[in-house]
A protein has these predicted regions:
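Residue-level preference for long, well-ordered alpha-helices that form the structural scaffold
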Residues: 81-84, 88, 160, 249, ...
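C-terminal cap of thioredoxin/glutaredoxin-like
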Residues: 3-4, 11-12, 28-32, 43-55, ...
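Short hydrophobic/aromatic-rich motifs at helix boundaries and adjacent loops
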Residues: 21-23, 61-66, 169-171, 231-233, ...
Length: 435
């Protein structure tokens, strides 16, 4: 590891974390823009929030600018187009259930003819502002709820009675859009996952006229969905298991592992299994994002020393040198030393200190690189677009999700499992009464 990184990372990271937060006032001259694709399921979910957002924007932020692209971008994490499409449909279904979006029980990608008809309707309509957003929401409903008859009727009317319109706040182009996102002052916000963060930013700058109410069932950090003792016992008795596939050089791995271990594992009796991955180059991360997540999740962070490939390998060697039943505590301690004490496991002095702290007398003789490659392979089989990857097993069901944006799913799944359990018990009781 670079001596500069070992010396200066802990100093810089501590300063960055502790410096007074002066909320930068972002320029508003470009307004607020949302980028959509008619064949993007996240755009469909976002479209259901836009009329409300437009309604509470201040006059200087109106109108909300809409860019509709017909060009997708390459799927993340080397996923195939089909894998990405299926992932998005499944994920959107989960989001729609959690936040009560309108969504079809068996969603399908709209066909090319329907997409062309939808674009024609939106190009031809003379409606503007909130009226246009309501129309666009209706058009998205027709596309994604398989209401093709309604779409054809509206298309015929639009083609017959209106010409193509040209409004500055409505743009049709080929900007590559992977999934819907907002743009404000050259900053991007994912249209669903970052909507609350965007709303907080707009509220801080007094760019909203009313309190934003989006994603009504959002689960905050350190907030538990289940607090009733009887319900809690039900979940604990099901012995849930959670596999975590983590890149050791990624601070999000530490923040999520620490949060889950400290806040959820004992509370819900979750057995945690850790699968470290080979170096993915995630030490070049967004310091602001990691700092913000640390403060919101109340997980200690900094001073840190960003691990290199060699440091990640050394961390994995320590992890696999302790007995299996001690590996969770070992990984927690290794990551804690790196991300809150500024230790560099590729530096022999720090490595030896970690080894003593973990009571490791003999280092493993396993081929660590090979072991990490095996974990990589298992992780890739989960077909997830980002890290960390999580797999939760409970009540003979398995649920796979990923990243800091989906940690709330752990508690949401538990709540749904309880709901199904009680529903099944009630049905059984009703059947017994009949007999």
């Amino acid at each position: 590891m670079s001596l500069l990184r070992r010396w200066f990372d802990p100093i810089r990271s501590s300063w960055f974390y502790q410096k007074p937060v002066r909320q930068e006032v972002l320029p508003t001259d470009q307004g607020l823009t949302i980028y959509l694709r008619l064949d993007d399921v996240y755009s469909y979910l976002a479209a259901q929030q836009l009329p409300q957002l437009e309604e509470i924007l201040t006059d200087e932020m109106k109108p909300l600018k809409v860019v509709i692209s017909n060009q997708t971008a390459s799927p993340p994490n080397e996923m195939s187009a089909l894998e990405w499409q299926q992932y998005c449909l499944n994920d959107a279904k989960i989001l729609s259930k959690q936040h009560r979006f309108s969504f079809h029980e068996t969603p399908e990608q709209p066909n090319a003819e329907a997409l062309q008809q939808a674009e024609t309707i939106l190009r031809h309509t003379p409606l503007r502002g909130q009226d246009f957003l309501y129309l666009m929401e209706d058009v998205f409903h027709m596309l994604w709820q398989k209401q093709y008859g309604k779409l054809r009727t509206l298309h015929a009317m639009a083609s017959r009675h209106h010409q193509v319109q040209n409004f500055p706040e409505r743009v049709f182009n080929q900007t590559p859009v992977l999934s819907a996102y907002f743009e404000f002052a050259d900053r991007k916000y994912q249209a669903v996952d970052d909507l609350l963060r965007l709303a907080r930013r707009l509220e801080q700058q007094k760019l909203l006229t009313d309190n934003p109410i989006f994603l009504i069932n959002h689960i905050e950090w350190r907030e538990h969905l289940i607090s009733d003792a009887e319900e809690l016992n039900e979940i604990q008795a099901l012995d849930p298991e959670l596999d975590l596939y983590i890149a050791l050089e990624d601070p999000i791995s530490w923040l999520l592992l620490a949060y889950i271990k400290e806040e959820l594992a004992d509370y819900y009796n979750i057995q945690l299994n850790i699968y470290p991955l080979s170096y993915h180059g995630r030490d070049q991360f967004d310091w602001s994002l990691a700092t913000r997540l640390s403060k919101r999740s109340e997980v200690k962070f900094t001073p840190f020393c960003r691990p290199t490939a060699a440091a990640s390998l050394a961390m994995a060697e320590l992890f696999y040198s302790v007995p299996a039943e001690q590996q969770l505590e070992a990984m927690y301690e290794i990551l804690r030393q790196v991300w809150t004490k500024g230790k560099d496991p590729s530096f022999k002095t720090h490595f030896d200190q970690l080894r003593r702290d973990l009571n490791i007398e003999q280092l493993t003789e396993q081929d660590i690189s090979l072991r990490l490659q095996q974990n990589d392979m298992y992780c890739e089989m989960k077909s997830q677009p980002s890290l960390p990857v999580l797999e939760l097993r409970i009540a003979e069901q398995s649920y796979v999700f990923n990243s800091l944006y989906r940690v709330w799913m752990i508690e949401s799944i538990f709540s749904n499992v309880l709901e199904e359990l009680y529903k099944s018990e009630n049905e059984s009781e009703n059947e017994q009464r009949k007999t």
